[in-house]
């Protein structure tokens, strides 16, 4: 499988997990929304890594983006996207660790308005990553 095909697969996965996170948000399930948004960020990270020929199965793809930033010549637009992915990843990682109540199903301390902002940021970020993917093919 070449880099472009792999990146294409991760774009499709990103679309799917972003839709699942949106559906979970609409159902009021903040924990599952956070989980799926994290997966979306991982998939978007894999899109960027694949486009630049980096495949790493040992670490989180979001963490490997730092290697991409220092090992390849990338423009400021891509660096900005990398920083935004990493920032959102840190926010979501903290949210997923905190459970509201041990007697209920898993939940997070964030409320709908805050999660909506994160969902909107990830959606916007997806559009940017898809734009980079498209730029690679034109």
Task: Briefly describe each language-model feature range.
Residues 24, 43, 50-51:
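Residue position in alpha-helical solenoids
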Residues 1-32, 138:
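Charged alpha-helical initiation segments
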Residues 49-138:
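Long, charged low-complexity segments
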Residues 18, 37, 126:
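Short amphipathic alpha-helical/adjacent loop interface patches that line ligand
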Residues 33-34, 40:
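Solenoid-repeat scaffolds in large eukaryotic assemblies
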